[in-house]
């Protein structure tokens, strides 16, 4: 299947090092190099759990023995080992689905990753009203009420697959001008 990699994505009060977009799920990846500490990790874990279906932490070899004390048992753990001219990755633990966040809350968070033109496209393909002059939060709630969630997971991923960072500012301007009174 398709995969899109988005680096340094703001999520709540943290920044996800890597967000993997798959056809029906979002995966968060936190990277802790040998030079990093665990100072922000508790906050990052909470924030990742609000958005992602699965989470991994990738650690340097100095963290591999103790990282499991710092992340939940359902997070995957990957050890990155530096070789002379390459890096070797060892999966120490596979992730399990993140069921910790309330389902409704997590869907709302996932939709909040999308920009207004992307939400507008989801409304359009599902035959929904445009809700001009309504807040993003209102639109997200209406989408959640109207669109079956198994379909919505795929539509969120499709919007993120199609996202073009080179043209989005123009698309947002266009959306704003077409949604004025």
Residue spans of the language-model regions?
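Acidic, metal-dependent phosphodiester-chemistry machinery of nucleic-acid enzymes
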Residues: 1, 150-181
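Active-site metal-binding core of divalent-cation-utilizing nuclease and nuclease-like domains
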Residues: 1-23, 27, 142
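Conserved beta-strand termini and adjacent loop/short-helix elements that scaffold enzyme active sites
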Residues: 8, 80-83, 92
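Short acidic-glycine loop/turn motifs at beta-strand connectors
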Residues: 22-24, 81-85
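Short beta-strand-loop-alpha-helix junction that forms the active-site gateway
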Residues: 25, 31-38
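Short catalytic-loop micro-motif centered on adjacent basic/acidic residues
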Residues: 28-30, 56-57
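Catalytic cores of nucleic-acid endonucleases
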Residues: 36-81
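A conserved mid-domain beta-alpha-beta active-site/ligand-binding segment of alpha/beta enzyme cores
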Residues: 86-161
